[in-house]
Amino acid sequence: MASHSDTLVVFFGATAGANGGKLGSDERELILLVWQIVDLHENKVGKLHRTLVQPDSVDLSEQCKEETGLTAEELCKAEPLESVLQQFHQSVSAELKSLGRSSYTLCVDGPLLIRQVLHPEASKKNLVLPECFYTFVDLKKEFHKCCPNAGPVKDLTLLSMLDYVCIQATVEQEAGLREVKDMVLLILHVLADPYNHKFSAFETVNYKFESGACSKTEAVDSETVIRARGLPWQSSDQDIARFFKGLNIAKGGVALCLNAQGRRNGEALVRFINSEHRDMALDRHKHHMGSRYIEVYKATGEEFLKIAGGTSNEVAQFLSKENQMIIRMRGLPFTATPQDVLGFLGPECPVTDGTEGLLFVKYPDGRPTGDAFVLFACEEYAQNALKKHKQILGKRYIELFRSTAAEVQQVLNRYMSTPLISTLPPPPPPMVSVPVLATPPFITTGNTRDCIRLRGLPYTAAIEDILEFMGEHTIDIKPHGVHMVLNQQGRPSGDAFIQMKSADRAFMVAQKCHKKMMKDRYVEVFQCSTEEMSFVLMGGTLNRSGLSPPPCKLPCLSPPTYAAFPAAPAMLPTEAALYQPPLLATPRTPQAPTHSPAPAFAYYSPQLYMNMNMSYTTYYPSPPVSPSTVSYFAAPPGSVAAAVAAQPTPAILPPQPGALVRMQGLPYNAGVKDILSFFQGYQLQADSVLVLYNWSGQRSGEALVTFPSEKAARRAVAECSNIPLSGHPIHLACCE
């Protein structure tokens, strides 16, 4: 398309649904196109053309029937969009040739027809639009240049512009014809004295989305950013750009959000070139990507930079190569070298610049994480690489996914940043009982009611479901502030605690989300304090009777041995969490337990340690630990040291009778009953078995079993080791 044009083609369209200012907001198809040529040199007009378009669905809205006068019968006889666009191109080209002109530009009454209707519909139908549909003149903006006092561009209409210059609107019965005639009158008017206007400011539609890096220091206008929610997990930045086809996304302006496991959570932040395009993007709320509808909301520049921004020179250099396909590799052996990766990919998918096109993700201390990003020069090479998904390198299968520049930044930011708390400290020996603090070390207890409790969650609910349930309030969650409560079998209990940024935010969530539905269940939401949350996370209960203290023992590791629990302060019943403090009645004080005296310290259950390490940081990728790591130790050493320091004299621990046997290689569906059957004849009880879970809350294939004596444990290891359970040979070992 030339930088200037000999002619304008005045272009008008209508859909089967909303028209006017809401054109394209309901995803309805084009049913009518009207056009007419205007010679800018001779101030002459060509023939007026009107063509019906057959949609895939001829269901017309009442507004459409009233405004256009069209019927389903007429549309069934029309040609489909692809044929009509070919007719349009041939007709305009022939007419231009007869006029002796060489180029033309579309002229429309606002950008909606081109950006919100034609490009999205052509994209969904896999139609290739002619080049002329990527450049156009917006008559409203051109008129505003001539008549700036006519009002803001967004408030201008065809009739208001005609009224401003005192032109009588065309009297025409057929819809489309009158609009085109009125637009032609306006164009001829501004071409003449006193305006003598030159049409030179052309709007453009991007041919494709350009990926790129974004710096944390870059200024991002919040009026240009949206959040898209409900995306298919496998969608890429190109898929999102296609969903917003017709709107111009800034370079590197798609940032896919990741969950705590480093997987896409169905959300993305998208940055457009200006606020006008952002506003049109908001009108695509609940439009469809395939069979899924996508929610579109306003977002901020700060949120975008949190996901897409990066400062690493290594990342900037890696992403400096433009128009590259990015593939993420996950699960690499920690000893893998660049040559190993290049050999795995093979000659059929050459990496851009060889080893320079590889970026290994590492921890701050230089240890590899098992992730890497790879650059490919074209789509063909990227597709060949994706065919190697779950093939073996060394002894591990490798996952390959499409990735984006923003995802590279996210993952590197996460791994290279210093964690707020150590995620996996070296554990103490499992046979040694350790005194710990009476509160979780990661939570500062207090009476400030800046937490919420979710009760009645579906047992299949994951952290992503909770974040979706909270909606817009997700941004008010503290880092590492989501705590899933598991029962003593390591299964979800239906409860979760969430730490909010303030008591006001917690109160707001409790008010708005209480008894809101999640899947097929309603969920109760109560405001509470960190003190109440700590009691429950340690094994206590928070119910209609108020708080009950946690049992002071290590479950499943030894026969019951209780320690005294000091009298707790006044506790609030759960229902009180919905009300502000002035409305609360005086709470009652629970009675202290009457067990035999013992040192004043408590034990963490394995449940607590798992809960604390399943915390979630919004949009962060996988936690810096191996997914197969088993979390069954009583407490992290930090809390151990603090507890020991707090003791005036060395604590005397109650004796731990029995001996512990570790089982490895269990089927993932094996439960306590299966393990008891495996050790039939050893007179074990259900509470002697502890099934271990990994960081994802799934069974790890291991268990700990307490035998009444060391002799019985050694006999079980000798007799039962390598005996199959459901086809899996079980390895047994005594824990010394």
Curated annotation (Swiss-Prot):
GO terms for molecular function: mRNA binding. The keyword RNA-binding applies. It is found in: Nucleus. Transmembrane segments: none annotated. InterPro entries: ESRP, Nucleotide-bd_a/b_plait_sf, RBD_domain_sf, RNaseH-like_sf, RNaseH_sf, RRM_dom. GO terms for cellular component: nucleoplasm; nucleus; ribonucleoprotein complex. The keyword Lyase does not apply. Keywords: mRNA processing, mRNA splicing, Nucleus, Repeat, RNA-binding. Its main location: nucleus. PROSITE patterns: RRM. Residues 224-301, 325-405, 659-736 form the RRM domain. GO terms for biological process: cranial skeletal system development; hard palate morphogenesis; mRNA processing; regulation of RNA splicing; RNA splicing. PANTHER family: HETEROGENEOUS NUCLEAR RIBONUCLEOPROTEIN-RELATED (PTHR13976). mRNA splicing factor that regulates the formation of epithelial cell-specific isoforms. Specifically regulates the expression of FGFR2-IIIb, an epithelial cell-specific isoform of fgfr2. Acts by directly binding specific sequences in mRNAs. Binds the GU-rich sequence motifs in the ISE/ISS-3, a cis-element regulatory region present in the mRNA of fgfr2. Belongs to the ESRP family. This is Epithelial splicing regulatory protein 2.
